[in-house]
Amino acid sequence: MKLLVIGNGGREHALAWKLAQSPKVETVFVAPGNAGTAIEPKLQNIDLTAHQDLIEFCRKENIVFTVVGPEAPLAAGVVDDFRAAGLKIFGPTQYAAQLESSKDFAKAFMAKYNIPTAQYQTFENADAAHDYVNQKGAPIVIKADGLAAGKGVIVAMTLDEAHAAIDDMLLDNKMGNAGARVVIEDFLQGEEASFIVMVDGNNVLPMATSQDHKRLLDGDKGLNTGGMGAYSPAPVVTPVVYERAMNEIILPTVAGMKAEGHEFTGFLYAGLMIDQSGAPYTIEFNCRFGDPETQPIMSRLNSDLSDLVEAAIDGKLDSVTAEWSPQTAVGVVLAAQNYPETPKKGDVISGLDAANQVGKVFHAGTTANEKGDVLTNGGRVLCVVGLGDNVVQAKAKAYGALEKISFDGMQYRKDIADKAINR
């Protein structure tokens, strides 16, 4: 069968790569894809992004189903458009995707359905926001309401930082429409984890646990990014935390969306903060697989992903199980110079073949020129995954592969997975 994956990042490379491993799959088309998906066996890039063009392509090629990678097409209603055209697609509707595309929508939804999260208020008026912050004190968290590519969250450790973030979003329009409203919420202490599940509207199939590293620099310092690395499984998610996350967060969310008359289908990602007592709180929802979490998680999936997605689209997730490798996977992101602010593009990347002999290199912000050179073409350029019998071995494999790669201004964290190693 022929499948389609929408997107051009590392997450989409990993999803398409895993789908293509199925003996039932002939070709996975990636729209628009990157330099990695262009050369991966059984994958083929297509230069289409408009919904109607993609729908016509699916009809012409008899695509069995489509998987949506990034948040922007979901927020733009790609699932609604495909369903209206009678095509099978895995992802949430535009309404359901508001769990990610509007922080205010998500917080109000969590309050309504008693899903544990930080206390919050939403503001469009800067003066009112400044007053609220003065009343609450720091540390405090300022979030752009809309989609900001993972960079719309400011964890303000001082009042000055909080006031500056409010001005940036509400007065200086630094985030555009995404920051025209801000959600201000209490700062939660604890350890973060990514809890990702597949949902068919009613049933839930959990994916392997993982932990992302949002900050640019070692020791969780520097600016927030889309994610600088991840590992799976995440030992912070103990069996007890796992049960609590399912029963207190995931299942009430799925039931709540159904009660709202908008069944949730697709990948649902709860960004968790686990406090000292082991209680999970929801920091955010994403309505798609995480990036870079997808890369290590897919590296551990032994099941046929196409079977899981088909079951989810058909509302039969309760009839399948996901089998996972007992190994640990560590993925480290290589980012471009000046990421996350003004990443430099067009630098030649060398050492990819050598790195793939050691680990697995997933491409994100890459493109190829006429000569066949692979060039940087975005902020997060590559994600290098290593597998090992334990987290120490997996980390060594990932960094061993990464050392083969070079491009001008390449930056990466050296402490990915250290939280698991030091537990």
Q: Residues of each region from the PLM?
A:
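Solvent-exposed alpha-helices and their adjacent loops that cap or buttress functional pockets
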Residues: 21, 38-39, 90, 112-114, ...
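ATP-binding N-terminal substructure of ATP-dependent carboxylate-amine bond-forming enzymes
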Residues: 1-94
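Internal nucleotide-binding/catalytic subdomain
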Residues: 152, 156-294
